[in-house]
Amino acid sequence: LGLVHVFCRQDSLLLDTVAGQAEGLVSHLDRYVIREEVTFTDQSDQGQTMLIAGPDAGQTLVSLVQSSIPEDPLGHVEVAFAGHPLSIRRCPTPLDGFWIHGDAISLDALTPLLADDGCREIDETVVEMLRVEAGIPCYGVDLDDQNLPQEVNRDTQAISFTKGCYLGQETVARIDA
């Protein structure tokens, strides 16, 4: 399994990972559901995501969506825009960056406003460069399920050395020692 970000919503959790991982992730997590009332739903094909990054990204978003934006690394907020929900997630890039996820209608309404505010589109090559510069490993490119978090510098984001029992705790503790 690759790195998964978990976002708390009002009545659910959203698990965000790289494309193509939903089936394996659901299968893996489903093994640990015993009595809880849990339903896993693959929403990979629901919505689109764009990245806005740069020194004025936060200020631009605040003015366009008329809402506060996440301050903490990997923080997120859910807002309404053009009558549709948008999820704004702070992403770790060398520049101030935010992932914006929503349906096609809301992103289509947001895109020209971003352009009017001076934002310009960048291609996948630049997004990939930002990812590499930020030291963010990509599952299937830089790592696979044979890598431990410490091997790809995920200690601070993916490991708790103080939390109680969890799967893999012994291996993680040995590497930390």
Put a short name on every predicted segment.
Residues L1-A177:
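Basic, glycine/lysine-rich polyanion-binding surfaces/domains
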